[in-house]
């Protein structure tokens, strides 16, 4: 609270009393009322068709058993024409007329058309291996083909799954490893076109249990959740891999041949690579199957526990199926009716605890939010909107910031702000009695030690000092030079800067220089957008409590100073793309609280009771740790007299309200009656029976009243004692400070110039829960946070008159979501498998038709002197590019030359010609003209080399040394 602004009226302030700071301290899908389809009804058609197989075979020449009805699902609520079926009498008798036979053929063609296939009759089928049976029982009397078993195994209609030209596999057979399951009503159609095969009861039948388990539950809005999308991706990949593996099974002769030495190298490479590819595919299938089961178990765990599929609903099914289910509901077994009655009874039965007057908590315990008393579970949705890091519902254009501190340990409440680029954190005290935002900077010799290091202005790429010549931004005095370092490499002493001086009612004072930079409320993880603010204060001097306090600076949220210098909140209110309402709220608890900019928190309010009554000192009041059931029964408590009380603001210098008086049990304070003073009580005494509530009245046209409970004006001290927060400030004006704000949500409406009060259950935040700043070494230990990844958005102040870029997106805290991490992991696994396959294919060597060559030495080297003539001849052969280090010819010839050199040492009159692969006894002199000639002693000591000796194993007459061409083929 600023000093020297006292008047006859009272005003609200966050300044405390004279006490100094001491040691710190799945959307549930709608359930259908109809009974769930019984597996007995689904298999009834199959058993009946199998039982009539002898009759159908006896009359094969004239007729065949009819196929089941096929419903084409083209859209929601559209009923399509069903294929004509055979009457029950004709089925039971086993005989049909010519007309019935014609209807049967038409039925099959209609069903085939629904499936998007071309039906072929018995006479046109020929010797095709693929069946075209459309009934559930497999009426052809032929064992299922490979294509049908492949479809049953893969669950995906893939072109690789069929060997014949016909596209309709057998959906179910007696030898199928997977029995058909009832297809859920309202679910998407099966894979074969847009149709499903139904049983006798009219229920669609699914060919796979896997397809039912993988069927996702769609959102009512039509948007699938991310986990459902991930499950669909896993199902698709698994199905494709299953199809590829079974496709390899269709061609065992081509892919399983053993290596043949007479075959060409390319065929051998293809055979080996195909076997390696099969092994890799099997390993990949196992991996994807494990991932699918793991992901599907978490998605469908709740569905498996329920006897009724959660997506069975008449409203979501096609009209034909819905009407059919309604008509045939009377034919359901009695057991299903009983189960349906139990489920309806459970839905109509009140929740456990409501019978006893209790309600359950609707917010998670870890969120720090307690449901407001007076609200029942039926009044609030069980599945609320998504919450943010503070456990509150996410709202657009609303900024939130944690408040830390307490009345006893700190005597103030503070929040964190991020300043500069890259951001640096500063802790600032929330003050409704001033309008200055300031904190110490690096180089301040008269500043104390605080929670965070002093801001280094030279590190900020977006900061700039405010010059005295800038009259539109400088409203203070001018400095003639300070010891602070400059922004952008310059010192502030080189020019005259805009300066500020601020004093407070408890005797503290600060002095510093203004600068402009970007500022964001809260921690980095909250991702509140930063804004450009031209009036950030940089301390050069601190006195009294500012030196010893833990918080670094001050954050004033009062009205602008002199109606010219806007506060940080005024800058945010000036742009509609940031906030919708010019309103902020403060909710303070025993330890910590919450600051909300752009609105208030309705979920934290305490709802009023059904009936209001006069105040009673015996009434119970909600305190910390009290159950919700006890709070709900408080129907006579004056704490719930009004949900929200508004009073007008009569002055814009501070938040001044027309306070008319305070009354305690009929006694008006300030009329000669002694106040409570610093009374101490025992912690075990019932406060509600000793200390009465205080009724605070405001002198506006509505005669607004707010109740001030002992939990607010009493605060805990050490040793189990309490002290009251009432004190005489020795001036004529009254101050409603922290003790009045406690356990209330105070709303400051700047548009309508009013202040609102409402009882609330404010969240608590302790200092050990405070995250670390952008620098890993800043602040106490806690959860690390990431700095800004992009430069902050520059938002001009209202006086600039410039436009504001809209739709600015803030950097995300995590680069990828959990669903994206799953997809990235799958892609990494696939990339590794592809790399292993390529390596295996490249490691397969092509065999040569010639005999084996001598292995290359580990470190091949020239067996002669560097400047000798043999070296010249050897280098000449290599220079033509015919021979290389990895060439077998080069390796073989080098090995032979070394063997000759070991037998007879190399001399000057013997040379090796690499191109001709032979030794010569004389020097042509056409390679190195400056070669040194060996001395006479060396010529005498060196033995002569004769290539024509019969005893030499490497004679020049041996033609085998010259048979190999240079290419090695």
Curated annotation (Swiss-Prot):
<feature type="topological domain" description="Lumenal">
    <location>
        <begin position="23"/>
        <end position="820"/>
    </location>
</feature>
<dbReference type="InterPro" id="IPR021109">
    <property type="entry name" value="Peptidase_aspartic_dom_sf"/>
</dbReference>
<keyword id="KW-1133">Transmembrane helix</keyword>
<feature type="region of interest" description="Disordered">
    <location>
        <begin position="173"/>
        <end position="193"/>
    </location>
</feature>
<dbReference type="Pfam" id="PF14543">
    <property type="entry name" value="TAXi_N"/>
</dbReference>
<feature type="region of interest" description="Disordered">
    <location>
        <begin position="608"/>
        <end position="635"/>
    </location>
</feature>
<feature type="active site">
    <location>
        <position position="431"/>
    </location>
</feature>
<feature type="region of interest" description="Disordered">
    <location>
        <begin position="922"/>
        <end position="969"/>
    </location>
</feature>
<dbReference type="InterPro" id="IPR001461">
    <property type="entry name" value="Aspartic_peptidase_A1"/>
</dbReference>
<feature type="signal peptide">
    <location>
        <begin position="1"/>
        <end position="22"/>
    </location>
</feature>
<feature type="compositionally biased region" description="Polar residues">
    <location>
        <begin position="952"/>
        <end position="961"/>
    </location>
</feature>
<feature type="region of interest" description="Disordered">
    <location>
        <begin position="79"/>
        <end position="104"/>
    </location>
</feature>
<keyword id="KW-0333">Golgi apparatus</keyword>
<feature type="region of interest" description="Disordered">
    <location>
        <begin position="128"/>
        <end position="149"/>
    </location>
</feature>
<dbReference type="GO" id="GO:0004190">
    <property type="term" value="F:aspartic-type endopeptidase activity"/>
</dbReference>
<keyword id="KW-0064">Aspartyl protease</keyword>
<keyword id="KW-0378">Hydrolase</keyword>
<feature type="compositionally biased region" description="Low complexity">
    <location>
        <begin position="1"/>
        <end position="45"/>
    </location>
</feature>
<feature type="domain" description="Peptidase A1">
    <location>
        <begin position="413"/>
        <end position="758"/>
    </location>
</feature>
<feature type="region of interest" description="Disordered">
    <location>
        <begin position="311"/>
        <end position="382"/>
    </location>
</feature>
<comment type="function">
    <text>In tachyzoites, plays an essential role in the export of several dense granule proteins into the host cell by cleaving the localization motif RRLxx (termed Toxoplasma export element (TEXEL)) located downstream of the N-terminal secretory signal sequence. However, can also regulate the export of proteins that lack the TEXEL motif, such as GRA24. Requires Arg at P3 and P2, and Leu at P1 in the substrate TEXEL motif and, specifically, cleaves after Leu. Cleaves GRA16; proteolytic cleavage is essential for the correct trafficking of GRA16 from the parasite into the infected host nucleus.</text>
</comment>
<dbReference type="GO" id="GO:0006508">
    <property type="term" value="P:proteolysis"/>
</dbReference>
<feature type="region of interest" description="Disordered">
    <location>
        <begin position="1"/>
        <end position="65"/>
    </location>
</feature>
<dbReference type="InterPro" id="IPR032799">
    <property type="entry name" value="TAXi_C"/>
</dbReference>
<dbReference type="InterPro" id="IPR032861">
    <property type="entry name" value="TAXi_N"/>
</dbReference>
<feature type="compositionally biased region" description="Basic and acidic residues">
    <location>
        <begin position="769"/>
        <end position="781"/>
    </location>
</feature>
<keyword id="KW-0812">Transmembrane</keyword>
<dbReference type="Pfam" id="PF14541">
    <property type="entry name" value="TAXi_C"/>
</dbReference>
<dbReference type="GO" id="GO:0000139">
    <property type="term" value="C:Golgi membrane"/>
</dbReference>
<dbReference type="InterPro" id="IPR001969">
    <property type="entry name" value="Aspartic_peptidase_AS"/>
</dbReference>
<keyword id="KW-0472">Membrane</keyword>
<comment type="similarity">
    <text>Belongs to the peptidase A1 family.</text>
</comment>
<feature type="compositionally biased region" description="Low complexity">
    <location>
        <begin position="311"/>
        <end position="324"/>
    </location>
</feature>
<keyword id="KW-0645">Protease</keyword>
<feature type="transmembrane region" description="Helical">
    <location>
        <begin position="821"/>
        <end position="841"/>
    </location>
</feature>
<feature type="region of interest" description="Disordered">
    <location>
        <begin position="768"/>
        <end position="794"/>
    </location>
</feature>
<protein>
    <recommendedName>
        <fullName>Aspartic protease 5</fullName>
        <ecNumber>3.4.23.-</ecNumber>
    </recommendedName>
</protein>
<dbReference type="InterPro" id="IPR033121">
    <property type="entry name" value="PEPTIDASE_A1"/>
</dbReference>
<feature type="topological domain" description="Cytoplasmic">
    <location>
        <begin position="842"/>
        <end position="969"/>
    </location>
</feature>
<keyword id="KW-0732">Signal</keyword>
<feature type="compositionally biased region" description="Basic and acidic residues">
    <location>
        <begin position="335"/>
        <end position="355"/>
    </location>
</feature>
<feature type="active site">
    <location>
        <position position="682"/>
    </location>
</feature>
